[in-house]
Amino acid sequence: MPIGDSAPPTPSPPPERLTGLGPVADARTVVLVLGSFPGVASLRAQQYYAHPHNQFWPVLQALWPQHPLPGRDDYAARCAWLLARGLGLWDVYAACERAGSLDARIRNAALNDFAALRARCPRLAAIAHNGGESFRHAKAVRAVLGDGLPSLRLPSTSPANASWRFERKCNAWAEALAPFGLVDTIGPQENCCG
């Protein structure tokens, strides 16, 4: 083959269509925490926030220090613990195409059916968006769940959000959830995590 001639690059296959997880929410849910879409580790485990470096579960434990969080090996107990605290979990997207776990790679996403969720959560008082990608859809989510519901923009607990220290994330989450009576700690003035 002459110099400079090379075979054309082989196009990479399109990312596969991924389907998210169902909601963890019930009649006790006061604040619904919405992520964007489960990462690879979470999809593999079929558990929200399964990546060992995601700080979601440690942040929640810091907010409820008097109530020990069940271990990583008992996801059902973790979900029951979360529901007992008035929180619910879901994602903005029901399905999407994505290579890897980064939100920036999400393509052709479809929103979840928030109308069906609303009936399950009669006490719902706020939507807490875990990160910027989720918050981008706050208006669309609120249009279905209720325009009167506040949309809280929380710092992402993802390991990709390294610019926020753990303590700073804890304090931001505590400050956002305290008005709904959902945390043992009050917020930054008590330095719940530090």
Which role does the model predict for each range below?
Residues W64-P65, C121, R142-L145:
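A broad structural signal for alpha-helix termini and local helix breaks/kinks
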Residues L32-S36:
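N-terminal nucleotide-binding beta1-loop-alpha1 segment
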Residues M1-V30, H51-P52, G100-A115, K139-G194:
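C-terminal capping/extension of enzyme domains
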Residues A84-S134:
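Internal catalytic-core helix/loop-beta-alpha segment
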Residues F37, A41, E133:
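Gly/Ser/Thr-rich beta-alpha loop segments that engage phosphate groups in nucleotides
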